Amino acid sequence: MIRVYTQRQQGKNWLQRYQGYKPIFGCILGFTDTGLIPGISAAGATPQDRQYTCLADIEFLYNGLQLQPQYPLPPLEAGASPVLITKAIIDTLNIPLYLFNAGLYHKPTVPTIDLGGAPARCLTSGHALDLATIQHLLEVGSYWGRKLADEAKDSYVILGECVVGGTTTALAVLLGLGIGAIGKVNSSHPQCNHDQKLAVVHQGLQEAGFHSALPVSEPLKLVAAVGDPMQIVVAGMGMAASLKVGVMLAGGTQMLAVYALMQVLAEKLSLLWRPENIVVGTTRWVAEDPTGDTVGLAQEIGCVPLMATQLHFDESCYPQLQAYERGYVKEGVGCGGCAITAHLYRNWNQTQLLKAVEDLFASFIFLE
């Protein structure tokens, strides 16, 4: 149920080390106006819908099924929110949940830990966030990384994200770091919109005065210019937690960008971390997306173990879940990492994973 795609021995060692352990799950929430560009993301059918995707996802993640949610899960072109996968797993396995608000326009309807960040402007501005905000988020992320490590004790921490438009800010950071990511990233679209993403990213890097062919020497300025608030929080959190416990960065393109950022923070700012304790965990739909090259991207970054759950919805009786097999949605809210955990912690197989998700989805569509 788990396949390791890169740095196989390190990835297998990590899996063996944490087999049978119950982790804790932290989901880092953020917003970027980049996600409102028409057509940039399918995480919400319209830009108006995408303003509230994160709020709806975390309300569902925390409260579960409700007759009248304040923020209902948004309509999608096809598929169903990945939060359904995450929720089914963390509830069934009783995995502790921490929600971190790194920067949202609207106050969440459920309890979150406010990190004192801010939502990001569109990356085309070349000034997505103030440098002081990035510096603060790195510090507070590191603080909470240490706290989560203490809570996890001998186990590991899953760090997921909820940022609409986040694969585009990820591409911007990757190119700014000098990583050959063109044509390799993923999106929530069935066919990745590489040309649109690249045009947006080039505009932002040019506005900020960064040359995408040269690795940046000041990573915090890069994230402030073209990034989003989640990235720097997870980087600080993951690096700090890795000094004591295992860390799974639960996501695809976005978490590979965070890992690349960690490497540069360690090199340029001498931040301490233990990279042997960190893996990136995602879904098969991301790792094997024929319209991107996730494995190639991980190899470009270097030294990062990339693994994915082999969960599939081929045999699902719900067309919304079957849509994942046609390339829709793919990942989000840490669903891939949580599916990996279901097998690692309780040895769940395909049948058990599918049943947990379908049981929740059946109740969800009954209430709709």
UniProtKB/Swiss-Prot annotation:
SUPFAM superfamilies: Nicotinate mononucleotide:5,6-dimethylbenzimidazole phosphoribosyltransferase (CobT). The lineage of its organism: Bacteria, Bacillati, Cyanobacteriota, Cyanophyceae, Oscillatoriophycideae. This is UPF0284 protein Tery_1555. HAMAP family: UPF0284. GO terms for molecular function: nicotinate-nucleotide-dimethylbenzimidazole phosphoribosyltransferase activity. NCBIfam families: nicotinate mononucleotide-dependent phosphoribosyltransferase CobT, PRK04447.1-6. Belongs to the UPF0284 family.
